[in-house]
Amino acid sequence: VTGALTAWSHYGSAEAFLLDDVRMAHLTRGDLAALDAADPLASFRDRFMLPEGVIYLDGNSLGPVPKATPGRVADVVAREWGNALIRAWTEHGWIDSPARVGDKIGRLIGAAPGSTVVADSTSVNLFKLLAAALDARPGRLVILTETGNFPTDLYMAQGLVALLGRGHALRVVDDPRGALGPDVAVLMLTHVNYRSGAMHDMAAMTHAAHAAGALVLWDLSHSAGAVPLQLAADDVDLAVGCGYKFLNGGPGAPAFLSVAPRLQAGLRLPLTGWLGHAEPFAFDPVYWPAAGIARAVVGTPPVLSLAALEVGVDLMLQAPVAELRAKSVRLADLFLTLVAQECADDGFAPLTPANASQRGSQVSFAHPDGYAIMQALIERGVIGDFRAPDALRFGLAPLYVRYVDVWDAVAVLHDVMRIGSWRDLRFQTRRSVT
């Protein structure tokens, strides 16, 4: 091992050290193993179920299983449900779980207490909040978003506009900030782009929308648990996000939504289910919305899924946000630099900004044969994913991804390209999930 730790400290930042061409040329796997040994987050890796022989770089699509999750879910089934039966709704706090877990997520995203609730899916929550935003801005008919936004965001807006049929429109532009105007009711943006990993300046975009009289709805699906967020400080109006990526809540984990306290009393939602009623067990035939964020709950909460999600969220809350972000930046800088160094002639075009302040916790590369290359990597134990038409994505969740994982992943990528294994016909057939 060379003096990597000392040199890193001397440079003042990981990115300055890693991107120094001279030092990078002499960096060894042993240097990175030393960095892993000194990593203040290293112990978190042991709290996840990670198969031997696998480098898991797809936590931006589905987080791995926290080791505490199976036991917690089994306890809910056998002890809470098994013994308390229907009494568990109150005795074990099931009925309060959307608000309880929501407030925990609220701490992760910097939202005010009582602003966040767990409910439904990201798509459904988008629909609910887009409809509420249009209702809150009568006379403004445009939902504004950007080219390349995640498809479900676009689909839900398209469906809502078609359903309303009152002259509303979805406007998709390359420069949403420049397109803000008096007809825009809500600016809908994804904070970290699903394909490239590029990240918006949340405070600046929110301020610009407010200056134009519009509300802002942020999709935090690739942000929550991955980058520092300050919804309250940035004066964010509305937000949604999913629970199965960086929050490690499990496949199909329920999503969350967040509404600024100043907007909650006037929030009129299009889905008015019984658990969003002011008195659900009064069984009033007329709907009256619950106070605050509770009105955003529609139906009976998925208790088992919420229990799994809560384990993942509790784990995230134990990790210092500053250390998470610092390591995320280092991992991405290392990955980008190693690919540029080891795969310079292999046709990989970085999609992810080199500037750490402009990206989330993933790196992506465009390649015309990206799908086949990713399948070849997966067969070799390096699990990332592919997004059409040509993007290879590598999620860098700092709770369990090590510096040596990045080194080893790029080494496998280099070898796959060197021997051309990705050309095998079995890697050409698209699976239903990519």
Task: Enumerate the predicted regions with their spans.
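Pyridoxal 5′-phosphate
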Residues: 3-434
